[in-house]
Amino acid sequence: EKKVTDKCAFYGVPLCKVPDRYVLGGAIGKDARVVVAVTDEGFARQLQTMLDRSLWG
């Protein structure tokens, strides 16, 4: 986790943490995932919005 956090901070990449790998996988329609990189800005914004709604109400 620290390595990914440090890399994101160094390169100025937004980071969104979720409680477990199943939430992350479900958000992109896949099986459990530990890390996902999203290069499409529109999809990244929508994914972050969906995760925020599902995790924090």
Swiss-Prot record:
Chain's role: RNA-binding protein that recognizes the K-turn motif present in ribosomal RNA, but also in box C/D and box C'/D' sRNAs.
TM helices/strands, residue ranges: none
Coiled coil: none
Disulfide bonds: none
Organism: Geobacillus stearothermophilus (Bacillus stearothermophilus)
Keywords noted in UniProt: RNA-binding
Family from the record: Belongs to the eukaryotic ribosomal protein eL8 family.
Name of the protein: RNA-binding protein YlxQ
Xref: SUPFAM superfamilies: L30e-like (SSF55315)
Gene3D superfamilies: 3.30.1330.30
GO molecular function, one term: RNA binding
Gene that specifies this protein: ylxQ
